[in-house]
């Protein structure tokens, strides 16, 4: 349960969680006498299936919110109405605990019995942390603390706060992505130079180039997504599809909970073939945000529905490069004969059960009428259209 929780909240570091948490989870599991591959699966499921949930506002919130606002602006060019990065915050806080509980339960009662006791096949050697590396970690931690204090001072002195010291709509939230970027950059530099990994700026450049080399396909995909979104805005095709779709759904009486569940399942299905959450939302938002607005739903609510469909099947899509990284690590260190089918077949029950329970949780939340974020409900505010 703890590993599942750590994996879920790990998305504050975005995709880094998928790389770091599964190997660490394997070591923890092996340390308590459990099968390390199960630990990798639990850590991976938490980081992937629970990717959209967090106790804090993360970069994912800001990224999706920006795409949602672009869709609103394309639909109503003269509007000042926007959604905030916190528009799904309340719902996602409780979803974090839900994801951890469901993933933990599934791992204990469904995955662990399949693998049984670990017999020690494979090579799993834990390298000892050197004194220099410990100094690097201390330097990174100290840097993070100082940086957070500076940000807090900026907020409470009014530089990063909104009107009347408000958190919602503040420059702190609007600039969350660059703030997190600088935080991780400073921590990385502090560790690198203290631990001796970096000697000069050339070493930093080489490390950045090495990591960005694997992002080439994603950058290329983002380019075509940008062209797609630009063409949609120029031709107004998204608006036409939204109006036609909204009229058709309203005429058929297909609204409310059935519509919400159908949209969640659509996103869940497409996610198996296109694993990037931002890329899918860049395609979906120009169509579905206006469509749901015409049906009377808040754009933040539509974004929430997308996130509910986008997360659980992250764990089972073979299109994600991270599941292949988990497979390679498992084969190298713990189970030489494990295949991709074994991983997916064990992760599939987690994805399905989590999706079902999450949708039920959403329906209860929706029927009660609780806000999904500060000042955000399911209904579109009066006077927007």
Regions found by a protein language model. Give the residues of each.
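Hydrophobic core segments of alpha-helical transmembrane domains in multi-pass membrane transport
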Residues: 3-8, 46-50, 91-109, 141-156, ...
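Interfacial loop-to-helix junctions that mark the boundaries of transmembrane helices
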Residues: 82-94, 131-137, 164-180, 250-254, ...
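Juxtamembrane interface elements at the cytosolic ends of transmembrane helices
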Residues: 102-125, 153-163, 181-201, 327
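Hydrophobic, small-residue-rich membrane helices and short re-entrant helix-turn-helix hairpins
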Residues: 121-138, 163-167, 193-215, 336-345
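Short helix-coil transition sites and intra-membrane helix breaks within transmembrane domains
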Residues: 10-20, 55-59, 195-198, 230-239, ...
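Membrane-core helix-loop-helix motifs of multi-pass transport proteins
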Residues: 22-118, 304-308, 323-364, 370, ...
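Core transmembrane alpha-helical segments of multi-pass membrane transporters/permeases
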Residues: 169-239
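Hydrophobic alpha-helical transmembrane segments of multi-pass integral membrane proteins
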Residues: 1-26, 31-32, 219-228, 250-290, ...
């Amino acid at each position: 349960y703890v590993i599942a929780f750590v994996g879920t909240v790990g998305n504050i570091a975005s995709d880094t969680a998928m790389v770091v948490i599964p190997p660490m989870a394997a070591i923890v599991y092996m340390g308590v006498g459990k099968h390390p591959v199960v630990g990798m699966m639990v850590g991976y499921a938490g980081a992937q299936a629970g990717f959209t949930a967090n106790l804090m506002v993360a970069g994912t919130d800001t990224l999706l919110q920006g795409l949602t606002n672009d869709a609103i602006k394309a639909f109503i060019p003269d509007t000042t109405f926007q959604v905030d990065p916190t528009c799904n915050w309340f719902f996602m806080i409780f979803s974090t605990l839900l994801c951890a509980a469901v993933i933990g339960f599934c791992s204990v009662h469904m995955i662990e019995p399949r693998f049984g006791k670990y017999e020690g096949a494979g090579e799993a050697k834990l390298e000892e942390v050197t004194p220099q590396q410990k100094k690097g970690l201390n330097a990174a931690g100290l840097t993070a603390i100082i940086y957070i204090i500076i940000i807090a001072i900026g907020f409470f002195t009014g530089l990063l706060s909104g009107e009347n010291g408000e958190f919602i709509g503040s420059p702190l939230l609007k600039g969350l992505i660059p703030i997190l970027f600088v935080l991780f950059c400073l921590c990385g530099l502090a560790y690198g130079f203290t631990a001796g990994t970096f000697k000069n700026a050339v070493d930093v450049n080489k490390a950045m180039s090495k990591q960005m080399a694997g992002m080439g396909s994603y950058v290329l995909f983002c380019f075509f997504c940008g062209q797609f979104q630009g063409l949609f805005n120029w031709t107004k095709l998204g608006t036409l599809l939204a109006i036609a779709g909204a009229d058709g759904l309203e005429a058929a009486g297909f609204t409310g909970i059935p519509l919400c569940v159908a949209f969640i399942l659509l996103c869940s299905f497409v996610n198996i073939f296109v694993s990037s959450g931002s890329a899918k939302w860049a395609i979906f938002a120009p169509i579905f945000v206006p469509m749901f607005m015409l049906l009377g739903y808040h754009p933040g609510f539509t974004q929430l529905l997308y996130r509910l469909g986008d997360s659980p099947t992250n764990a089972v899509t073979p299109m994600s490069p991270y599941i292949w990284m988990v497979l390679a690590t498992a084969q190298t260190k713990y189970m030489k004969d494990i295949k991709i089918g074994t991983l997916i077949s064990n992760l599939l029950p987690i994805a399905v059960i989590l999706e079902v329970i999450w949708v039920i949780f959403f329906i209860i939340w929706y029927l009660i009428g609780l806000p999904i974020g500060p000042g955000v409900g399911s209904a579109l505010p009066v006077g927007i259209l």
